[in-house]
Amino acid sequence: MKPLFYVGAIAVTFMFWSSGIAKAAHFSGTLGEMAHFGLQPAWFFAAGTIALQLAGSALVVLGGRFAWLGAAALALFTLATIPLGHAFWTLPPEAAFGERLIAEEHLSVVGGLMLAALLAKLYGPKWPSRDATR
């Protein structure tokens, strides 16, 4: 079950770790993206986004005790991007359709992250409990 867990964890976090790597590699473009969405200071939000995407992904992929934290951080980040970048309810119908689909996909990703956190608890690497060290 562990190899399948890791394949699934890598897949469910792909959009985050690949984005984090791309944002770090093209930091000037990332600064422009943050400024486009009105996030100032842009360097702060760019660095925070990269750190969250990479660290959150690593926590989920590694599984174990803190996988839920990585999944929760990525899920909250994903939910926050809906009103920030995909506010379909503010757009005319012809423009709203695509943004609504992206928002719906984001909700599916959140569900996948919730399942990843659960599976990490059930099948991920086992960490010693406090009782086991006494």
Language model feature labels by segment:
Residues M1-A25, W43-A55, L62-R134:
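Extended, low-polarity transmembrane helix blocks
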Residues A9, F27-Q40:
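Short juxtamembrane and helix-loop transition motifs at transmembrane-helix boundaries
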